[in-house]
C-alpha cells in the first residue's frame, strides 16, 4: 500500500499532523520510535504555556493565533479542557527586549495586553514580589495547555478517522526516489508520496546535516497553597531576572506549582546523556533565584523531571522541505517554545501533503537562513 503521507515522529507536531491530514481525507501512516505520549521527548510534564503576544518575535503571532483556534476546537473533544485560560503575566525589567517584543506584537495584532507597573502588579497578585523597575504585561486570553492530554486526543481522533499508526518501531533509513519516499523500520518498509520528519530532539540520526543541538532541560514542582491556584486567579507566568535568565511557570494544581528555567541546560549528543532529574547537582536549585526573589511564599521542591530542547542556532523554528527533496517536509528546531504551535504546524504539514500553498509566511523558518 502506498500512503499519501508518512509521519516520522508522532510526538506533538506529528500527532497533530496525523489527525489533520487524515481528517482532510489523506491516507496517512504515523510512526514513532516510542509509544506516544512518552517521557523521552519534549511534551511530557503535564502542561505547556500558550502566549499570543510573543516575545520571541512578531513572525510567530499569526501562527499562534491560528493555533489557539485549533486548540479551542480540540478541547471540544474532551470532557477535561486541553486549554485553560488562566492568563499569562510576563515579568521583567521595564527595558527588557523580550517585553518590548511582547508589547510590539500586541500593538501590531491588537491583542488584549495590560501593562502593570511594579506597584499595580504586586497589588493584583500579592504573592508576587518584583523590584521597582519591573513591569508586568498581562495577557488575559492566554493560559496553559495540557500537553499529554492533547497528544492522546490527536492520536485517538486520528485512529478513529482511519489513520494507520506504527509505534515502538524506529525508522532506520529514509529513501527518496521519483515515486516518493520509502522508510525502513523494524516492521518492514513503507511507501508514501510525501513525508513529514517531525522526529524532535534526535532528528539528526535520520538527517545528520540539520543544524539542531539537543539540550537537556529540567523543570520541577514546588509546594504551594491555594493562593497560587487558578481558583485565586493566579496566572501562568514568564519572568526575566536582572541577569537575563528567563523562567516560566504555571498556577499551582493540587498544591504544587511547576516552574522551569528556559535558558541554560546541558548540551547532549545521545539519548542516554539525558540524565533524570537530580542527576545534575544544580537541578533542584535551578529555580531558586526566581522563587526566592519573585515568589518567596513558595515551599520546597517536591519532584522534578528532565526533558530535551531541539535548539536551532537562532532558536527559531525550522519549517522547510529537505534540500533536494521537495516531497519531504521537516519541522524541527522548536527550541523549547514549540508545543503551543503544534496544531498549526500539524495543519501546515497536512496542507503540504495536500499540495496546498501555506497560509502563512514561512520564509523566516527556512533552512537557507543558516547559509546566508
UniProtKB/Swiss-Prot annotation:
Top EC class of this enzyme: oxidoreductase
One Gene Ontology term of the molecular function aspect: flavin adenine dinucleotide binding
Enzyme nomenclature, EC number: 1.5.3.-
Organism the protein comes from: Salmonella typhi
Protein function: Catalyzes the oxidative demethylation of N-methyl-L-tryptophan.
NCBIfam families on file: PRK11259.1 (NF008425)
Name of the protein in its database record: N-methyl-L-tryptophan oxidase
Binding-site residues for FAD, renumbered to this chain: 4-34
Reactions catalysed: N(alpha)-methyl-L-tryptophan + O2 + H2O = L-tryptophan + formaldehyde + H2O2
Keyword Oxidoreductase listed: yes
Lineage of the species this protein comes from: Bacteria, Pseudomonadati, Pseudomonadota, Gammaproteobacteria, Enterobacterales
Keywords: FAD, Flavoprotein, Oxidoreductase
Co-factor(s): FAD
Quaternary state and interactors: Monomer.
PTM sites of type S-8alpha-FAD cysteine: 307
Amino acid at each position: 500500500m502506498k500512503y499519501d503521507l508518512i509521519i516520522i515522529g508522532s510526538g506533538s507536531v506529528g500527532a497533530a499532523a496525523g489527525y489533520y491530514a487524515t481528517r482532510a481525507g489523506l491516507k496517512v501512516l504515523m510512526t514513532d520510535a516510542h509509544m506516544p505520549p512518552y517521557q523521552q521527548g519534549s511534551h511530557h510534564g503535564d502542561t505547556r504555556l500558550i502566549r499570543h503576544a510573543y516575545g520571541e518575535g512578531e513572525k510567530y503571532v499569526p501562527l499562534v493565533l491560528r493555533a489557539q483556534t485549533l486548540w479551542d476546537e480540540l478541547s471540544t473533544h474532551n470532557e477535561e479542557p486541553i486549554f485553560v485560560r488562566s492568563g499569562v503575566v510576563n515579568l521583567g525589567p521595564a527595558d527588557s527586549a523580550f517585553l518590548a517584543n511582547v508589547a510590539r506584537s500586541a500593538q501590531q495584532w491588537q491583542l488584549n495586553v495590560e501593562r502593570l507597573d511594579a506597584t499595580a502588579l504586586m497589588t493584583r497578585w500579592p504573592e508576587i514580589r518584583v523590584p521597582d523597575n519591573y513591569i508586568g504585561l498581562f495577557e488575559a486570553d492566554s493560559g496553559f495547555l495540557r500537553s499529554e492530554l492533547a497528544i492522546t486526543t490527536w492520536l485517538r481522533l486520528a485512529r478513529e478517522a482511519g489513520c494507520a499508526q506504527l509505534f515502538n518501531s524506529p525508522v532506520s533509513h529514509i529513501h527518496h526516489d521519483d515515486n516518493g519516499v520509502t522508510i525502513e523500520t523494524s516492521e518492514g518498509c513503507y511507501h508514501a508520496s510525501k513525508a513529514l520528519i517531525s522526529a524532535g530532539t534526535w532528528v539528526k540520526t535520520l538527517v545528520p546535516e540539520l543544524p539542531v543541538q539537543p539540550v537537556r532541560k529540567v523543570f520541577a514542582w514546588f509546594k504551594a497553597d491555594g493562593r497560587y491556584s487558578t481558583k485565586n486567579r493566579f496566572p501562568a507566568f514568564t519572568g526575566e531576572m536582572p541577569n537575563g535568565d528567563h523562567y516560566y511557570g504555571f498556577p499551582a494544581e493540587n498544591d504544587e506549582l511547576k516552574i522551569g528555567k528556559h535558558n541554560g541546560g546541558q548540551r547532549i549528543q545521545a539519548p542516554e546523556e539525558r540524565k533524570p532529574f537530580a542527576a545534575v547537582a544544580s537541578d533542584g536549585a535551578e529555580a531558586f533565584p526566581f522563587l526566592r526573589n519573585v515568589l518567596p511564599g513558595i515551599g520546597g521542591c517536591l519532584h522534578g523531571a528532565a526533558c530535551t530542547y531541539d535548539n536551532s542556532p537562532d532558536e527559531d523554528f525550522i519549517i522547510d522541505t529537505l534540500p533536494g527533496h521537495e516531497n519531504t517536509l521537516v519541522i524541527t528546531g522548536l527550541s523549547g517554545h514549540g508545543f503551543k504551535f503544534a496544531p498549526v504546524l500539524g495543519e501546515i504539514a497536512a496542507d503540504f501533503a495536500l499540495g496546498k500553498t501555506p497560509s502563512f509566511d514561512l520564509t523566516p523558518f527556512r533552512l537557507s537562513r543558516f547559509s546566508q
